[in-house]
Curated annotation (Swiss-Prot):
Protein known as: Chorismate synthase
GO cellular component, one term: cytosol
Quaternary state and interactors: Homotetramer.
Organism lineage string: Bacteria, Bacillati, Cyanobacteriota, Cyanophyceae, Synechococcales
Residues involved in NADP(+) binding: R47
Role played: This reaction introduces a second double bond into the aromatic ring system.
Note on how the cofactor is bound: Reduced FMN (FMNH(2)).
Molecular-function GO terms, alphabetical: chorismate synthase activity; FMN binding
Length: 362
Protein backbone atom coordinates (compact mmCIF):
# COMPACT_ATOMS: atom_id res chain seq x y z
CA UNK A 1 0.00 0.00 0.00
CA UNK A 2 2.75 2.45 -0.90
CA UNK A 3 5.45 1.49 1.60
CA UNK A 4 7.00 -1.35 -0.43
CA UNK A 5 9.30 -1.18 -3.45
CA UNK A 6 10.77 -3.76 -5.82
CA UNK A 7 9.74 -7.09 -7.29
CA UNK A 8 12.26 -9.84 -6.47
CA UNK A 9 14.58 -7.68 -4.35
CA UNK A 10 11.82 -6.05 -2.34
CA UNK A 11 11.87 -3.63 0.56
CA UNK A 12 9.13 -2.48 2.94
CA UNK A 13 9.82 0.54 5.13
CA UNK A 14 8.16 1.72 8.34
CA UNK A 15 8.42 4.45 10.95
CA UNK A 16 8.02 8.20 11.41
CA UNK A 17 10.42 11.03 12.13
CA UNK A 18 9.25 11.46 15.74
CA UNK A 19 8.19 7.87 16.42
CA UNK A 20 10.22 5.12 18.04
CA UNK A 21 12.39 4.59 15.00
CA UNK A 22 12.61 3.86 11.28
CA UNK A 23 13.15 0.44 9.77
CA UNK A 24 13.03 -1.80 6.73
CA UNK A 25 12.41 -5.41 5.82
CA UNK A 26 14.40 -6.67 2.83
CA UNK A 27 13.01 -9.72 1.04
CA UNK A 28 14.58 -11.62 -1.83
CA UNK A 29 18.24 -11.01 -1.09
CA UNK A 30 20.10 -14.11 -2.28
CA UNK A 31 21.57 -16.40 0.39
CA UNK A 32 25.29 -16.76 1.12
CA UNK A 33 26.09 -13.10 0.48
CA UNK A 34 28.72 -12.12 3.04
CA UNK A 35 27.97 -8.59 4.17
CA UNK A 36 30.32 -5.95 5.52
CA UNK A 37 28.18 -4.44 8.27
CA UNK A 38 30.53 -1.49 8.61
CA UNK A 39 29.69 -0.49 5.05
CA UNK A 40 25.99 -0.45 5.90
CA UNK A 41 26.68 1.84 8.85
CA UNK A 42 29.00 3.99 6.73
CA UNK A 43 26.19 4.68 4.25
CA UNK A 44 23.88 5.68 7.10
CA UNK A 45 26.59 7.97 8.47
CA UNK A 46 26.72 9.76 5.11
CA UNK A 47 22.96 10.38 5.39
CA UNK A 48 22.61 11.16 9.10
CA UNK A 49 21.72 14.65 10.38
CA UNK A 50 24.06 17.02 12.17
CA UNK A 51 27.10 16.07 10.10
CA UNK A 52 28.08 19.59 9.00
CA UNK A 53 27.31 23.29 9.29
CA UNK A 54 25.03 23.15 6.24
CA UNK A 55 22.77 20.35 7.49
CA UNK A 56 20.08 20.16 10.15
CA UNK A 57 21.45 20.48 13.71
CA UNK A 58 19.41 17.45 14.83
CA UNK A 59 21.84 14.99 16.40
CA UNK A 60 21.18 11.31 15.72
CA UNK A 61 23.74 8.52 15.77
CA UNK A 62 21.56 6.43 13.43
CA UNK A 63 23.11 3.16 14.57
CA UNK A 64 21.54 0.29 12.66
CA UNK A 65 20.28 -2.83 14.42
CA UNK A 66 20.00 -5.93 12.25
CA UNK A 67 17.31 -8.13 13.75
CA UNK A 68 17.09 -11.06 11.35
CA UNK A 69 18.22 -12.64 8.11
CA UNK A 70 21.95 -13.05 8.84
CA UNK A 71 24.18 -15.75 10.29
CA UNK A 72 27.75 -14.67 10.99
CA UNK A 73 27.16 -11.63 8.74
CA UNK A 74 26.08 -13.88 5.85
CA UNK A 75 22.60 -13.67 4.34
CA UNK A 76 20.29 -16.63 4.87
CA UNK A 77 17.92 -15.88 2.00
CA UNK A 78 15.22 -15.03 4.57
CA UNK A 79 13.83 -11.56 5.34
CA UNK A 80 16.42 -9.11 6.66
CA UNK A 81 14.96 -6.74 9.25
CA UNK A 82 16.82 -3.56 10.21
CA UNK A 83 15.85 -0.70 12.50
CA UNK A 84 17.33 2.65 13.57
CA UNK A 85 15.98 4.18 16.79
CA UNK A 86 15.01 7.86 17.02
CA UNK A 87 16.74 9.52 19.98
CA UNK A 88 16.83 13.29 19.40
CA UNK A 89 13.31 14.20 18.31
CA UNK A 90 11.72 17.30 19.83
CA UNK A 91 7.97 17.41 19.13
CA UNK A 92 7.67 20.76 20.93
CA UNK A 93 9.56 22.43 18.10
CA UNK A 94 6.66 21.67 15.77
CA UNK A 95 3.76 23.26 17.64
CA UNK A 96 3.30 25.87 14.89
CA UNK A 97 2.76 23.09 12.35
CA UNK A 98 0.01 21.58 14.50
CA UNK A 99 -2.29 24.42 13.52
CA UNK A 100 -0.95 25.66 10.17
CA UNK A 101 -0.14 23.88 6.92
CA UNK A 102 3.40 24.40 5.63
CA UNK A 103 3.32 25.73 2.03
CA UNK A 104 4.55 23.13 -0.50
CA UNK A 105 4.87 20.48 2.24
CA UNK A 106 2.86 17.27 2.54
CA UNK A 107 0.90 18.53 5.58
CA UNK A 108 -2.21 19.56 3.67
CA UNK A 109 -2.32 16.62 1.26
CA UNK A 110 -1.75 14.00 3.99
CA UNK A 111 -4.58 15.56 5.98
CA UNK A 112 -6.84 15.58 2.92
CA UNK A 113 -6.07 11.92 2.13
CA UNK A 114 -6.05 10.30 5.57
CA UNK A 115 -8.02 12.72 7.74
CA UNK A 116 -5.27 12.41 10.33
CA UNK A 117 -1.51 12.85 10.31
CA UNK A 118 1.62 12.91 12.43
CA UNK A 119 2.35 16.63 12.16
CA UNK A 120 5.37 16.46 14.47
CA UNK A 121 8.46 15.98 12.33
CA UNK A 122 6.43 15.41 9.18
CA UNK A 123 5.60 11.77 9.92
CA UNK A 124 6.11 9.51 6.91
CA UNK A 125 6.66 12.54 4.68
CA UNK A 126 9.87 13.32 6.56
CA UNK A 127 13.17 12.55 4.86
CA UNK A 128 13.99 10.52 7.97
CA UNK A 129 12.07 7.68 6.29
CA UNK A 130 14.97 7.42 3.85
CA UNK A 131 17.11 5.82 6.58
CA UNK A 132 15.35 2.59 5.65
CA UNK A 133 16.14 3.01 1.96
CA UNK A 134 19.81 3.71 2.63
CA UNK A 135 20.19 0.66 4.88
CA UNK A 136 18.57 -1.59 2.28
CA UNK A 137 20.46 0.10 -0.55
CA UNK A 138 23.75 -0.62 1.21
CA UNK A 139 22.97 -4.33 0.97
CA UNK A 140 22.01 -3.95 -2.69
CA UNK A 141 25.32 -2.16 -3.32
CA UNK A 142 27.28 -5.07 -1.90
CA UNK A 143 25.26 -7.53 -3.98
CA UNK A 144 26.02 -5.56 -7.16
CA UNK A 145 29.71 -5.34 -6.32
CA UNK A 146 30.00 -9.07 -5.69
CA UNK A 147 27.98 -10.08 -8.75
CA UNK A 148 29.40 -7.72 -11.38
CA UNK A 149 31.79 -5.27 -9.71
CA UNK A 150 29.17 -2.60 -10.40
CA UNK A 151 29.75 0.83 -8.84
CA UNK A 152 26.98 3.32 -8.04
CA UNK A 153 28.21 6.84 -7.26
CA UNK A 154 26.36 10.15 -6.96
CA UNK A 155 27.33 13.75 -6.25
CA UNK A 156 25.94 17.27 -6.13
CA UNK A 157 26.07 18.90 -9.56
CA UNK A 158 24.13 22.09 -8.89
CA UNK A 159 23.11 24.18 -5.88
CA UNK A 160 20.70 27.04 -6.59
CA UNK A 161 22.27 28.83 -9.61
CA UNK A 162 25.77 27.35 -9.14
CA UNK A 163 26.46 24.43 -11.50
CA UNK A 164 29.71 22.46 -11.61
CA UNK A 165 31.31 21.07 -14.75
CA UNK A 166 31.97 17.41 -13.95
CA UNK A 167 33.14 14.48 -16.07
CA UNK A 168 31.07 11.59 -14.76
CA UNK A 169 33.70 9.03 -15.79
CA UNK A 170 36.47 10.61 -13.71
CA UNK A 171 34.73 11.07 -10.35
CA UNK A 172 35.76 8.93 -7.36
CA UNK A 173 34.14 8.49 -3.96
CA UNK A 174 37.11 10.34 -2.46
CA UNK A 175 36.37 13.32 -4.72
CA UNK A 176 32.75 13.35 -3.57
CA UNK A 177 33.52 13.03 0.13
CA UNK A 178 36.30 15.64 0.08
CA UNK A 179 33.90 18.42 1.10
CA UNK A 180 30.66 18.80 3.06
CA UNK A 181 28.48 19.62 0.06
CA UNK A 182 29.57 16.44 -1.80
CA UNK A 183 30.49 18.16 -5.06
CA UNK A 184 33.62 16.67 -6.71
CA UNK A 185 34.54 20.05 -8.20
CA UNK A 186 36.38 21.43 -5.18
CA UNK A 187 36.41 25.06 -6.35
CA UNK A 188 32.68 25.07 -7.03
CA UNK A 189 32.03 23.17 -3.80
CA UNK A 190 33.39 26.06 -1.73
CA UNK A 191 31.06 28.47 -3.52
CA UNK A 192 28.12 26.13 -2.96
CA UNK A 193 28.78 25.98 0.78
CA UNK A 194 28.90 29.78 0.92
CA UNK A 195 25.63 30.01 -1.03
CA UNK A 196 23.82 27.57 1.28
CA UNK A 197 25.05 29.43 4.36
CA UNK A 198 23.99 32.80 2.95
CA UNK A 199 20.51 31.57 2.07
CA UNK A 200 20.18 29.89 5.46
CA UNK A 201 21.01 33.15 7.23
CA UNK A 202 18.05 34.69 5.41
CA UNK A 203 15.82 32.03 6.93
CA UNK A 204 15.37 30.50 3.49
CA UNK A 205 16.35 27.34 1.61
CA UNK A 206 17.60 26.22 -1.81
CA UNK A 207 17.50 23.21 -4.11
CA UNK A 208 19.65 21.78 -6.88
CA UNK A 209 20.59 18.72 -8.93
CA UNK A 210 22.27 15.44 -8.04
CA UNK A 211 24.00 13.42 -10.75
CA UNK A 212 24.55 9.67 -10.45
CA UNK A 213 26.66 7.28 -12.51
CA UNK A 214 26.54 3.49 -12.61
CA UNK A 215 29.81 2.02 -13.84
CA UNK A 216 30.22 -1.54 -15.04
CA UNK A 217 26.48 -2.12 -15.21
CA UNK A 218 25.58 -5.56 -16.59
CA UNK A 219 24.17 -5.60 -20.10
CA UNK A 220 20.57 -6.67 -20.56
CA UNK A 221 18.92 -5.24 -17.45
CA UNK A 222 15.41 -3.87 -17.94
CA UNK A 223 12.00 -5.41 -18.67
CA UNK A 224 10.21 -3.79 -21.63
CA UNK A 225 7.76 -2.39 -22.00
CA UNK A 226 6.37 -1.10 -18.71
CA UNK A 227 9.38 -1.98 -16.55
CA UNK A 228 12.06 -0.40 -18.70
CA UNK A 229 15.08 0.31 -16.55
CA UNK A 230 14.91 4.08 -16.91
CA UNK A 231 11.21 3.97 -16.00
CA UNK A 232 11.96 2.12 -12.77
CA UNK A 233 14.90 4.41 -12.02
CA UNK A 234 12.63 7.41 -12.50
CA UNK A 235 10.01 5.96 -10.16
CA UNK A 236 12.66 5.15 -7.58
CA UNK A 237 14.21 8.60 -7.35
CA UNK A 238 10.95 10.46 -7.86
CA UNK A 239 9.61 8.71 -4.75
CA UNK A 240 12.21 10.59 -2.68
CA UNK A 241 11.14 13.59 -0.60
CA UNK A 242 11.64 16.92 -2.40
CA UNK A 243 12.46 15.33 -5.79
CA UNK A 244 10.95 17.23 -8.70
CA UNK A 245 12.66 16.10 -11.89
CA UNK A 246 14.50 13.22 -13.57
CA UNK A 247 16.58 12.92 -16.70
CA UNK A 248 18.90 10.32 -18.17
CA UNK A 249 21.80 10.69 -20.59
CA UNK A 250 21.39 13.83 -22.68
CA UNK A 251 18.03 14.41 -20.98
CA UNK A 252 16.13 17.51 -21.97
CA UNK A 253 19.26 18.90 -23.60
CA UNK A 254 18.98 16.16 -26.21
CA UNK A 255 15.90 17.86 -27.62
CA UNK A 256 18.20 20.56 -29.00
CA UNK A 257 20.14 18.05 -31.13
CA UNK A 258 19.43 16.45 -34.48
CA UNK A 259 19.25 12.68 -34.75
CA UNK A 260 22.62 12.56 -36.48
CA UNK A 261 24.12 14.48 -33.56
CA UNK A 262 22.38 12.54 -30.82
CA UNK A 263 22.81 8.96 -32.04
CA UNK A 264 25.49 6.95 -30.20
CA UNK A 265 27.61 5.25 -32.88
CA UNK A 266 28.56 1.65 -32.10
CA UNK A 267 32.26 0.77 -31.98
CA UNK A 268 34.08 -2.55 -32.45
CA UNK A 269 34.95 -4.29 -29.18
CA UNK A 270 37.18 -7.19 -28.19
CA UNK A 271 35.46 -7.96 -24.89
CA UNK A 272 32.03 -8.91 -26.22
CA UNK A 273 30.39 -5.78 -24.84
CA UNK A 274 28.68 -3.06 -26.81
CA UNK A 275 30.69 0.12 -27.02
CA UNK A 276 29.52 3.52 -28.23
CA UNK A 277 31.42 6.61 -29.31
CA UNK A 278 29.16 8.84 -27.20
CA UNK A 279 26.71 8.16 -24.39
CA UNK A 280 23.72 10.37 -25.05
CA UNK A 281 21.53 7.36 -24.27
CA UNK A 282 22.85 7.33 -20.72
CA UNK A 283 23.65 3.62 -20.85
CA UNK A 284 20.11 2.49 -21.64
CA UNK A 285 18.53 1.85 -25.04
CA UNK A 286 15.04 0.45 -25.51
CA UNK A 287 14.73 0.28 -21.74
CA UNK A 288 17.67 -2.16 -21.50
CA UNK A 289 21.23 -1.52 -20.34
CA UNK A 290 23.75 -1.52 -23.19
CA UNK A 291 26.88 -1.91 -21.05
CA UNK A 292 27.91 1.74 -21.07
CA UNK A 293 27.75 3.80 -17.88
CA UNK A 294 24.27 4.76 -16.74
CA UNK A 295 24.07 8.50 -16.07
CA UNK A 296 21.03 10.10 -14.46
CA UNK A 297 20.23 13.42 -12.82
CA UNK A 298 17.63 14.23 -10.17
CA UNK A 299 16.28 17.70 -9.37
CA UNK A 300 15.40 18.54 -5.76
CA UNK A 301 13.29 21.52 -4.77
CA UNK A 302 14.19 23.93 -1.96
CA UNK A 303 13.31 22.63 1.51
CA UNK A 304 9.67 23.54 2.19
CA UNK A 305 10.10 24.25 5.91
CA UNK A 306 11.77 27.65 6.31
CA UNK A 307 12.07 30.29 9.04
CA UNK A 308 10.81 33.13 6.85
CA UNK A 309 7.22 34.25 7.43
CA UNK A 310 4.85 32.60 4.95
CA UNK A 311 1.17 33.12 4.32
CA UNK A 312 -0.83 29.93 4.73
CA UNK A 313 -4.06 28.54 6.22
CA UNK A 314 -4.94 26.42 9.21
CA UNK A 315 -7.00 23.21 9.24
CA UNK A 316 -10.20 25.29 9.36
CA UNK A 317 -9.23 27.26 6.26
CA UNK A 318 -8.43 30.48 8.09
CA UNK A 319 -5.57 32.64 6.85
CA UNK A 320 -2.53 32.74 9.11
CA UNK A 321 1.21 33.40 9.06
CA UNK A 322 3.71 30.62 9.64
CA UNK A 323 7.34 30.99 10.68
CA UNK A 324 8.57 27.45 11.09
CA UNK A 325 10.72 26.46 14.02
CA UNK A 326 12.39 23.10 14.48
CA UNK A 327 15.60 21.81 12.92
CA UNK A 328 15.64 21.54 9.14
CA UNK A 329 18.18 21.34 6.33
CA UNK A 330 18.57 24.62 4.43
CA UNK A 331 19.43 22.39 1.45
CA UNK A 332 18.70 18.66 1.23
CA UNK A 333 21.20 17.83 -1.51
CA UNK A 334 24.39 16.99 0.43
CA UNK A 335 22.55 14.38 2.51
CA UNK A 336 20.48 13.18 -0.46
CA UNK A 337 23.55 11.90 -2.33
CA UNK A 338 23.67 8.50 -0.54
CA UNK A 339 19.88 8.28 -0.77
CA UNK A 340 19.96 8.57 -4.56
CA UNK A 341 22.72 5.95 -4.67
CA UNK A 342 20.58 3.65 -2.51
CA UNK A 343 17.50 3.89 -4.71
CA UNK A 344 19.51 3.31 -7.89
CA UNK A 345 21.18 0.29 -6.27
CA UNK A 346 17.83 -1.16 -5.23
CA UNK A 347 16.50 -0.90 -8.79
CA UNK A 348 19.62 -2.53 -10.25
CA UNK A 349 19.62 -5.36 -7.70
CA UNK A 350 15.97 -6.08 -8.43
CA UNK A 351 16.49 -6.10 -12.20
CA UNK A 352 19.62 -8.22 -11.87
CA UNK A 353 17.60 -10.94 -10.11
CA UNK A 354 14.78 -10.60 -12.65
CA UNK A 355 17.24 -10.95 -15.53
CA UNK A 356 18.79 -14.03 -13.93
CA UNK A 357 15.37 -15.58 -13.45
CA UNK A 358 14.09 -15.00 -16.97
CA UNK A 359 17.08 -15.08 -19.27
CA UNK A 360 19.87 -17.04 -17.57
CA UNK A 361 18.42 -20.51 -17.12
CA UNK A 362 20.25 -21.85 -20.19
Amino acid sequence: MGSSFGDLFRISTFGESHGGGVGVIVEGCPPRLELDLQKIQAELDRRKPGQSKISTPRKEEDQVEILSGLLNNTTLGTPIAMVVRNKDHKPGDYKEMNVAFRPSHADATYQAKYGIQARSGGGRASARETIARVAAGAIAKQLLTKAHNTEVLAWVKRIHTLEAEINAQDVSIDDVEANIVRCPNQVMAAQMVERIEAISREGDSCGGVIECVVRNAPMGLGMPVFDKLEADLAKAVMSLPASKGFEIGSGFGGTLLKGSEHNDAFLPSNDGRLRTATNNSGGIQGGITNGESIVIRVAFKPTATIRKDQQTIDADGNTTTLSAKGRHDPCVLPRAVPIVEAMVSLVLADHLLRQQGQCSLW
